[in-house]
């Protein structure tokens, strides 16, 4: 019996030794002269000085480098790992820089299905965000892509099965000497150290310049359970990079990795291989050509100087302190000028009370709408700031999403998503547009009601729009209503009182009490009621060409005006309509029943919606 027990103990002991050896992986590459246990594909290659080059001067390419031995996940022991590598991203001369690179953890070394450019050779369109991707990546991204909600063009992100990062931060490091974060330019061409540590389901990412030790504080910390990402428990680690039309050279100088806690091998930073910096090629020229070039240079100096000052004035921008407070994304005027082809008439979408709107296409993004606002002294600046504030604070599916802004001399520019179907008033009053069906009108009204309810009760502050009308409502590809144009908006704290005493708005939509009581949520509700009648009747609030008694669609409104929460309940038929008489005692003793009339018109219209498939 004793001998049998001894055999069992010995077998268990050797099994544990074997299991431990399977789970622990550790290696270091001070240079990559020896490619032992490395898998390279795509444009990846090792230069004579031992530098691992991922991408070169070719466009639309991918590169992958993986350590060939896999890491086995144990069901009994949580995975932990640490890696330290030094990389350098070098743009071509005269080019802002291409796409970045990433440290990758994957169950496979086969990325033939991946795409280049913004997908970094890791992801693709068809499986973007799919759990079956089974990929964890720490990206060093040098292209701003709003489709992936990138914060800027110089950031670090943690990606799980998608290029839409679960955690992101601008490239920087914590300086223990200065006690604050110092920024890092990923495209500086200088070596950058990166540390990735995973333990107890927490992923920490740190970075620092070549000469700085590992910071005491990580740049990014994200809770991630790798067991949820990798069901087959067999992993490979390595790097991926890609180029598009824009190109950068991406290099890895040294790399150390370990799954054993505290056993990450160090390499000598002072002995790193030199990073090459591409220069423009020059051919041998004869003295005659040299003299000719000198003459042309002198002749062109004045022209170039003039062009410089002309372009400097053309694209000059203004920056003020309030912009840093709101932290919204700022576009360069040059990028917007090029996106709209110089605000060409072919991209002109329309003109409103505060400026013209143009269609434009920014680099690597969908079409955008660029509003070029009119300048009118302090009032114009207030309208511009109001929209910038709304861009930072307000997020709702029925609001036009503002993406950024620009200010240049006396011009204010706002960038938003391009709404495919234009503004609502075009579909109501333009004979060239298809007539909206009753179901479409109902969806639009309910969407704007939801947006207005959010502005009044759901945002951090009470937001008074103060200019609700059909021309300020845009329609997306599915004909959902999106409320926009916050140039007249005002903000105040919940429970507070608005200081908006000026009577602003559009005639026909303005509540009568606004002249002596100022704006409030009730005046927004009045404008919404007029808008609702306008949509259901297909008639403008004011028609000057009609007989005097028929010019104004709605003249007065009852004092018992509902809140936006009640309006939504009415629209969803979750609350019975109030029983108003045709006229009630109210302002000037002539208060007609707007919400009753609007609801009556809407109810009769909507009751036919189930059978109405054609235009109303």
Swiss-Prot record:
Disulfide bond as UniProt keyword: no
Positions of transmembrane segments: 289-309
Membrane topology summary: Single-pass type I membrane protein
InterPro entries: ConA-like_dom_sf, Kinase-like_dom_sf, L-type_Lectin-RKs, Legume_lectin_dom, Prot_kinase_dom, Ser/Thr_kinase_AS
Enzyme class label: transferase
EC code: 2.7.11.1
Residue numbers binding ATP: 349-357, 371
Family (UniProt): In the C-terminal section; belongs to the protein kinase superfamily. Ser/Thr protein kinase family. In the N-terminal section; belongs to the leguminous lectin family.
Protein name, per record: Putative L-type lectin-domain containing receptor kinase I.10
Organism: Arabidopsis thaliana
